């Protein structure tokens, strides 16, 4: 794999942004509303909702800086949504039983269970293989981590969104699973081309082709990128609309704060809380073992480490017992994040403050991975020497947690 150069900051403009008819539109404003947008919502009401968000949400309070991260997201109230009065019985022959109960609120334009099933189907249709490196004898898993870390840096330089990075990560992993005997000198070309495709799908003004070539310091020419683009899309069967890890996370976090909203239209949640949890996702995605778990399970398990079991079950539709394996796998990563300290929200010139948390940042995840490996070895040693298994952090019950907080 050629030496990856440090990206240079360039301004990017793009007036053209058409997508193939086989790919659904992924234009920005709200990842969570790709399929949840109400066409009848007026512009006035959207502005009112936007203003209310910033009036109600203040800066981080002192009580969020406690030792336990489980206070970051409030415990949900014990209420249930009213059943949708719309009669969908005449569609019964076209349905199948959902794997988990839909956590989505009632929607005025569609049945929330149908929307939820569609989301779950994405995880089943877009298959990934954590063992794909066995097909490539010349490659090592750490090469993937180095490549993804570099792509994060490219995204930060060009102010690309998190969804763009996670799309590129998905395209890269699924494409590599279809190939054999890829040499390491081709990895950077595959990676930058995956990001090129993702940017054209997700960004309103993606960087131009020559900028993607420039960022590789000439290692990948424009012709090579365009040729690889067609190869990747063909081998992926033109299936370019996965439900990414960060898309799942956006939905779960908005459901957690749905009681403050009138409509499930736009992502409205504290940005500071968002970046704390998404840092855990940015770190764990560098480990190829993350491909063992569905993206929805990864997002819900990451929330578990910053919340309580009741909330996770409510917003994700998964039982904690279903998430147990992934929760345990994430423990070394959560420990490394805690050791590294709290993330700060970065602001970018030309990017709205309300959209700042959606810009992919590069926070030195490769250095944190060294701590992850140390934590993994430590936990394995503890499991061998201790009769009680370690590795699963169980948050306290809500009532006990509140009493403990008051005592402090």
UniProtKB/Swiss-Prot annotation:
GO terms, molecular function: cyclin-dependent protein serine/threonine kinase regulator activity
Post-translational changes noted in the entry: Phosphorylation by CDK2 triggers its release from CDK2 and degradation via the ubiquitin proteasome pathway.
A single GO cellular-component term on record: cytoplasm
One Pfam family in the UniProt entry: Cyclin_C
Positions of the UniProt region annotated as Disordered: 1-24, 56-85, 385-408
Compartments it resides in: Nucleus
InterPro entries assigned: Cyclin, Cyclin-like_dom, Cyclin-like_sf, Cyclin_C-dom, Cyclin_N, Cyclins_cyclin-box
Keyword Nucleus attributed: yes
One Gene Ontology biological process: positive regulation of G1/S transition of mitotic cell cycle
Motif range (Nuclear localization signal): 24-29
Main subcellular location of this protein, as a coarse class: nucleus
Keywords assigned by UniProt, alphabetized: Cell cycle, Cell division, Cyclin, Nucleus, Phosphoprotein
Similarity remark: Belongs to the cyclin family. Cyclin E subfamily.
Function: Essential for the control of the cell cycle at the G1/S (start) transition.
Protein name, entry field: G1/S-specific cyclin-E2
Species for this entry: Xenopus laevis (African clawed frog)
């Amino acid at each position: 794999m050629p030496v990856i150069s440090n990206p240079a900051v360039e301004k990017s403009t793009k007036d053209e942004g058409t997508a193939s008819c086989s790919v659904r539109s992924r234009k920005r404003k709200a990842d969570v509303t790709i399929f949840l947008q109400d066409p009848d919502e007026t512009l006035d009401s959207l502005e009112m909702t936007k203003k209310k968000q910033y009036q109600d949400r203040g800066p981080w309070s002192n009580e969020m800086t406690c030792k336990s991260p489980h206070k970051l997201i409030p415990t949900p109230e014990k209420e249930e949504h009213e059943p949708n009065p719309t009669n969908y019985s005449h569609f019964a022959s076209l349905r199948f039983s959902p794997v988990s109960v839909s956590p989505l609120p009632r929607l005025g334009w569609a049945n929330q269970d149908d929307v939820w099933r569609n989301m779950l189907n994405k995880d089943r249709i877009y298959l990934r293989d954590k063992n794909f490196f066995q097909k490539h004898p010349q490659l090592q898993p750490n090469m993937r981590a180095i490549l993804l870390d570099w792509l994060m840096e490219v995204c930060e330089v060009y102010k690309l969104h998190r969804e763009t990075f996670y799309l590129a990560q998905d395209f890269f992993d699924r494409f590599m699973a279809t190939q054999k005997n890829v040499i390491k000198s081709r990895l950077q070309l595959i990676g930058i081309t995956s990001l090129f495709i993702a940017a054209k799908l997700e960004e309103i003004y993606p960087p131009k082709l020559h900028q993607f070539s420039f960022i590789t310091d000439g290692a990948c020419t424009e012709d090579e990128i365009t040729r690889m683009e067609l190869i990747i899309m063909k081998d992926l069967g033109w299936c370019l609309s996965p439900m990414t890890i960060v898309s799942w996370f956006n939905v779960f976090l908005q459901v957690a704060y749905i009681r403050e909203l009138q409509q499930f239209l736009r992502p409205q949640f504290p940005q500071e809380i968002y970046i704390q949890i998404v840092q855990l996702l940015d770190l764990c995605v560098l480990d190829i073992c993350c491909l063992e778990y569905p993206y929805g399970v990864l997002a819900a398990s990451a929330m578990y480490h910053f919340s309580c079991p009741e909330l996770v079950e409510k917003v994700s539709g998964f039982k904690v017992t279903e998430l147990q394996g992934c929760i345990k796998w994430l423990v070394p990563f959560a420990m490394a994040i805690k050791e590294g300290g709290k993330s700060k929200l970065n602001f970018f010139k030309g990017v709205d403050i309300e959209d700042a948390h959606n810009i992919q940042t590069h926070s030195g995840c490769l250095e944190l991975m060294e701590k992850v490996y140390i934590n993994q070895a430590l936990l394995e040693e503890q499991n061998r020497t201790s009769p009680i298994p370690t590795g699963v952090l169980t948050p306290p019950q809500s009532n006990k947690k509140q009493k403990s907080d008051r005592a402090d």
